[in-house]
């Protein structure tokens, strides 16, 4: 067991599950960066969500956040534990640079026998991910979810079936939508971006009483490179990763934020009409590394 600077992550990992020790191996070191260029017509308030999430899922070795021109910025944490930044952008060109070196798992845990957790046994903080939300109208998907999962074991197998159904039924078209669409709208259209496919899967999971949440972050070797969205489902007393845009579930994921849907995990909210995003550049590079084992 690591000591010193790793002790907080060790403590959290031990207490994460209700049924024994949970071991997290962080064996991939990535450098991630996001550069945003805005043109500000009139001073505009922004709430940003660009720092990587701090938790046992990943270990942040280095974190850089630069804004030009330099102005005051307020840091806070939202109700889901995501890091938020609040500022008022001045008139003119406004640049934001964020980068981090992060240790993450090279592989995603796959546990086909992970069991369904009955609602009365769910942790309180998980309950909110059972309910319909703005972009995940789970109350509209019950019949379809039961049709998709009718021959599946309760739990992981149901979520895996839902993930496969979304990947095969909703066409993944990167860059096809600029604004968030609801799960009902995406199901009707039959195509969408990563966020859209994840939200359809979330709505389906919640409709059969499996908590599910949206994740936004970086994915190594994503083509075309951009920020990415996937989802997690709560089964077997922990969160498991799923991604309907990928035929093979893989690791190399750096998490920025979790939430109920796109409303909670937008990388920036602008207030007023005087803020234009002219360019966004995202990079994910693999670095030399030594694995970290967290017990």
Residue spans for each PLM region:
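Short, surface-exposed linear segments at secondary-structure transitions and domain or protein termini
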Residues: 71-73, 119-122, 249-258
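Intrinsically disordered, low-complexity N-terminal segments that are enriched in acidic
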Residues: 22-108
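Secondary-structure boundary elements
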Residues: 40, 96, 102-106, 112, ...
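Short intrinsically disordered coil segments
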Residues: 51-53, 112-120, 245-249, 271-273
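N-terminal polybasic/positive-inside topogenic patches
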Residues: 15-18
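Hydrophobic/aromatic-rich core segments of domains that either
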Residues: 164, 196-278
């Amino acid at each position: 067991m690591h000591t010193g600077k790793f002790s907080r992550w060790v403590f959290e990992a031990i207490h994460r599950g209700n049924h024994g020790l949970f071991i997290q191996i962080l064996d991939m070191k990535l450098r991630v960066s996001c550069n945003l260029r805005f043109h500000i017509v009139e001073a505009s308030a922004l709430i940003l969500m660009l720092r990587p999430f701090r938790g046992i899922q990943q270990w942040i070795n280095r974190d850089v956040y630069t804004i030009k021109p330099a102005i005051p910025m307020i840091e806070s944490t939202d109700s889901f534990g995501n890091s938020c930044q609040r500022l008022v952008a001045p008139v003119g060109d406004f640049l934001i640079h964020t980068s981090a070196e992060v240790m993450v798992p090279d592989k995603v845990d796959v546990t086909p026998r992970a069991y369904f957790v009955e609602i009365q046994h769910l942790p309180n903080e998980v309950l909110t991910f059972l309910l319909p939300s703005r972009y995940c109208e789970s109350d509209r998907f019950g019949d379809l979810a039961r049709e998709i999962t009718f021959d599946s074991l309760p739990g992981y197998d149901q979520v895996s079936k839902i993930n496969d159904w979304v990947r095969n039924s909703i066409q993944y078209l990167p860059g096809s939508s600029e604004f968030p669409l609801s799960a009902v709208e995406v199901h009707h259209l039959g195509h969408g971006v990563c966020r859209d496919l994840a939200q359809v899967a979330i709505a389906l999971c919640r409709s059969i009483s499996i908590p599910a949440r949206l994740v936004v972050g970086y994915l190594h070797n994503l083509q075309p490179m951009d920020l990415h969205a996937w989802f997690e489902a709560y089964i077997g007393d922990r969160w498991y990763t799923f991604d309907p845009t990928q035929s093979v579930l893989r690791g190399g994921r750096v998490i920025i934020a979790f939430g109920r849907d796109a409303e909670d995990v937008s990388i920036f909210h602008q207030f007023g009409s005087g803020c234009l995003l002219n360019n966004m550049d995202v990079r994910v590079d693999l670095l030399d590394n030594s694995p970290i084992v967290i017990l």
